[in-house]
């Protein structure tokens, strides 16, 4: 989209958004209760034909199963994904651990806590965003054996590209910095993985932020560190 393309050449002070990005990035820390232990089949923007075709087939099958099991629809999920993006951003800026515990998976929350606790006393962060849109890139289903000898539970993971205009500001504790402004918001294009348990009581949460779309495009080039082979 235009917003995603605009983020590739933005040359503003990126410290605030990089601080937020580090807090949002989750690295799986082993099997956690009530979630999958890792991201299933990490999505990359540029894939070979065979892998792309296989991925499409897997997503189509997973979509049909989600529709029958939880009444999943693409429009309603995209709306929820956009809202969750905003809710996580606001809770992260406020260092609201209680809200984050409801919005992200346990492993994702554990990865956020060091950055939140390292903030200087008296420092304030703020996050505002608008025009948030989410596009689905991949859907996967997997099982996880729960701790305590419980039966396996099924989970869904949906990878989305999230496009948003946002402003992230830091003030207090001797520092003032911002990414974007109300007049010229920063165009952010992120790739998020959302996860939920199927069945009763399941809700979508952030599993992991994979990075910006431009970062993933660079690492998935044929000569890059990612794989672009089929």
Give the role of each language-model region.
Residues 90, 98-224:
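Structured, amphipathic secondary-structure segments that form assembly/contact surfaces
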């Amino acid at each position: 989209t235009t917003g995603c393309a605009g983020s590739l050449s933005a040359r503003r002070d990126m410290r605030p958004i990089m601080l937020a990005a580090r807090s949002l990035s989750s690295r799986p820390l082993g099997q956690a209760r009530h979630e999958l232990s890792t991201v299933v089949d990490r999505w990359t923007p540029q894939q070979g034909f065979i892998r792309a075709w296989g991925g499409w087939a897997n997503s189509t099958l997973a979509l049909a199963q989600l529709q029958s099991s939880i009444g999943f629809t693409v429009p309603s999920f995209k709306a929820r994904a956009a809202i969750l993006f905003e809710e996580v951003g606001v809770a992260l800026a406020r260092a609201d651990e209680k809200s984050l515990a409801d919005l992200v998976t346990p492993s994702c929350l554990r990865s956020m806590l060091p950055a939140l606790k390292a903030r200087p006393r008296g420092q304030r962060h703020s996050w505002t965003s608008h025009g948030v849109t989410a596009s689905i890139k991949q859907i996967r289903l997997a099982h996880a054996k729960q701790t305590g000898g419980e039966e396996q539970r099924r989970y869904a993971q949906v990878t989305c590209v999230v496009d948003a205009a946002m402003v992230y500001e830091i003030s207090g504790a001797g520092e003032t910095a911002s990414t974007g402004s109300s007049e010229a918001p920063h165009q952010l294009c992120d790739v998020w993985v959302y996860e939920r348990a199927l069945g009763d009581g399941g809700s979508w949460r952030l599993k992991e932020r994979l990075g910006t779309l431009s970062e993933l495009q660079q690492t998935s080039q044929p000569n890059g560190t990612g794989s672009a082979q089929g």
